């Protein structure tokens, strides 16, 4: 899943996420089924979810070759991600979508785990807003915050 975060005037790369109306950076995370952080990728917010997911999967295919099943939200649906998964390995992606009949908030299976991880990261004051000048330091602070989970 991904999270768009506002940046400060400290500089560094930032973009505009038109869907969430946020100028800043986007964090893509991959968690295990317990919600513990496996991988994080931070980049400008103007990159779509399905495009950022390809970069996340490229980073983890060597480190975690035993992964087989990936759950994702509707923002990751599309042929681009399925093609990247086919090239990277023998992975199955399951898109968890909201039902058309749902009104308001609905807890979705498997997706709430990632949202809970974002909430855990959001409890860290340094991660509530992206204060860092570089993407590398922004990634590092998120990894440091995940140690206490």
Task: Enumerate the predicted regions with their spans.
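Polybasic low-complexity intrinsically disordered regions
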Residues: 1-90, 97-98, 145
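Basic, amphipathic alpha-helical segments enriched in Lys/Arg and hydrophobic/aromatic residues
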Residues: 83, 90, 95, 104-149
């Amino acid at each position: 899943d991904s999270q768009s975060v506002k940046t400060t005037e400290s500089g560094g790369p930032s973009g505009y996420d038109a869907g969430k109306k946020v100028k800043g950076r986007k964090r893509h995370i991959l968690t295990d089924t317990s919600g513990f952080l496996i991988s994080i990728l931070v980049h400008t917010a103007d990159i779509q979810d399905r495009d950022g997911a390809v970069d996340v999967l490229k980073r983890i295919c060597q480190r975690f070759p035993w992964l087989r099943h990936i759950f994702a939200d509707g923002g990751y649906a599309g042929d681009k991600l399925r093609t990247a998964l086919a090239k990277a390995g023998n992975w199955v992606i399951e898109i968890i979508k909201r039902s058309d009949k749902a009104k308001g908030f609905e807890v979705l299976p498997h997706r709430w785990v990632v949202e809970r991880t974002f909430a855990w990261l959001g409890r860290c004051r340094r991660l509530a807003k992206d204060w860092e000048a570089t993407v590398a330091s922004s990634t590092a602070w998120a990894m440091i915050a995940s140690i206490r989970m």
